[in-house]
């Protein structure tokens, strides 16, 4: 079920209820569109061969288990790691493609919350923007509005969020708003923690393991 031009999705759903459409009460999906009721890994494994590797705890440097292939996981992911324990949940901090290792940490680890990102493939939708400016951003579907400071440098947007935001991932789309007006968007190119690329922090922490 989709929003339509001037109608919000809630308004469309209300109309569907009034018309007794069968999809009126169908819950929203956050998965891949049009593949039906299939699990993400199951669907992707039809097109990407599995490539098992180790799951590494960034703090202890211990091997916690094995993954099916780093391409089946996303930064910030919690479910589906199959490495549960008494200490609490684990989250994906980084996917090291060269060594085929999945780097994880628990919720308290600061690197789970990057503090800035560069955005390329940009579209600026408002001509009179004065940078830097404070606005709101969304980095994934149905995410609550995130407060950011947006700047423009070397042909790219740079979003600063010193409070840290979980699960900002290279390749994701980023959309920026002033009040209810969409002012810009683009694709996350690189994520940073305290002005250094996150990948450099991770590679320094686990250099002997990768």
Residue ranges and their predicted role:
Residues 188, 206-209:
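Long C-terminal interaction/binding lobes of large macromolecular proteins
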Residues 3-201:
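Nucleotide-activated chemistry modules centered on ATP-dependent adenylation/adenylyltransferase
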